[in-house]
Amino acid sequence: MSFNNQSIDQLHDLLVKKEISATELTKATLEDIHAREQAVGSFITISDDMAIAQAKEIDDKGIDADNVMSGIPLAVKDNISTKGILTTAASKMLYNYEPIFDATAVEKLYAKDMIVIGKANMDEFAMGGSTETSYFKKTNNAWDHSKVPGGSSGGSAAAVASGQVRLSLGSDTGGSIRQPASFNGIVGMKPTYGRVSRFGLFAFGSSLDQIGPMSQTVKENAQLLTVISGHDVRDSTSSERTVGDFTAKIGQDIQGMKIALPKEYLGEGIAPGVKETIIKAAKHLEKLGAVIEEVSLPHSKYGVAVYYIIASSEASSNLQRFDGIRYGYRTENYKNLDDIYVNTRSEGFGDEVKRRIMLGTFSLSSGYYDAYYKKAGQVRSLIIQDFEKVFADYDLILGPTAPTTAFDLDSLNHDPVAMYLADILTIPVNLAGLPGISIPAGFDKGLPVGMQLIGPKFSEETIYQVAAAFEATTDYHKQQPKIFGGEN
């Protein structure tokens, strides 16, 4: 029996009433995963035995009636450390790495008796927008297997969209949760920078990275964010703000709420079908009582250039630790120490990772630091100021999550600039450290279109309020791909 059409609240009710056990739910979820995995390719590792053992432990002590996540399985992106489960970052460099510790976010999952059922495929070290740079496999879009699932959290998104799991964790450095959520027609939240501990997340861009939830519905997303949020002394960038219940405002009306629609978000490069869908979604929010007005974010057009200087610079520093000496892959082709360093990194990293290391090393090098990295930091400040000006008068910003729907597999592999531009609408949110969500807003030629809602720092509750109001009065989130039993 499959339970993948049951909401988290419904599953919790069944578990509390003992109509199903955590073990039965876990086994059913594993059946759904294996039945769809060949078609979608969401997972690098499926931890059958460990997940069932966890579920049996939870059954033995009993489901906690006050904990909606008790006994619920989920997928975790493979750049988030999981003790006893391979954590590869989809790289040859870490193809056999089994951590001896859990990331803080994973510790919080276990504290709520959640079950990590497997590790989701991704772009290598989270560098990519299509999940095609993975060392292990390519993941297919849940709606059309000839399309990409987005990236870098493509496996996490496809697993939810295809009905393999209800929930997953991803990470977002420049859109890596929101863009695949858009491409697969699910909900994906990039929280405020500092909202979720980065301890145990393999670092890509340390001033940009955030772990976040991916889900079938807005409420489930808020429920999972409530679990993983909170201060962590092991992450100096994590916020000390008290974490409440992110579902608190769900169900409240949005009458009188002011929402900005930047003209740059519907300009050049936005596919006509995507633009039409977002305009329709904005009008729907107006019918619900929101006030939608056009604004300008004039420096957002520089976001991609700024991002690829800053993120690549941070990556070149973070990835220095992978040298063939301490852990991970080591070349067998060496005569001296220099050979170990050079050949290990040449053989262990894929082309996209090496490209970004070179970009970052160049940007930080003597004679170029001021011209590139320092200037990028200055423009980043201008992008932040643009958002601050808008949020002085508006509650939220809306726009498309991505300029297009999911593109063909292998279509942009040899055009990195075109691939980078796919994140033009999500990158500024990371540069400013803001929270942003993608929710299903419609379809263009049979493929999902996501609407992005962006708020000031620590405004996740308000974002969920508006997202849930839209979701409750539309049926886009209820439509499913064929692999999940839908008609599309």
Curated annotation (Swiss-Prot):
GO molecular function: ATP binding; glutaminyl-tRNA synthase (glutamine-hydrolyzing) activity
Alphabetized InterPro entries for the sequence: Amidase, Amidase_CS, Amidase_dom, AS_sf, GatA
Pfam family, one: Amidase
A single GO BP: translation
Subunit field text: Heterotrimer of A, B and C subunits.
Main function: Allows the formation of correctly charged Gln-tRNA(Gln) through the transamidation of misacylated Glu-tRNA(Gln) in organisms which lack glutaminyl-tRNA synthetase. The reaction takes place in the presence of glutamine and ATP through an activated gamma-phospho-Glu-tRNA(Gln).
Gene3D superfamilies in UniProt: Amidase signature (AS) domain
Lineage, opening ranks: Bacteria, Bacillati, Bacillota, Bacilli, Lactobacillales
PROSITE patterns: AMIDASES
Enzyme Commission number: 6.3.5.7
Family listed: Belongs to the amidase family. GatA subfamily.
Catalytic residue list: K77 (charge relay system), S152 (charge relay system), S176 (acyl-ester intermediate)
HAMAP family xrefs: GatA
Name of the protein described by the UniProt record: Glutamyl-tRNA(Gln) amidotransferase subunit A
Catalyses which reaction(s): L-glutamyl-tRNA(Gln) + L-glutamine + ATP + H2O = L-glutaminyl-tRNA(Gln) + L-glutamate + ADP + phosphate + H(+)
Protein encoded by which gene: gatA
Keywords of the record: ATP-binding, Ligase, Nucleotide-binding, Protein biosynthesis
GO annotations of cellular component type: glutamyl-tRNA(Gln) amidotransferase complex
SUPFAM superfamilies: Amidase signature (AS) enzymes (SSF75304)
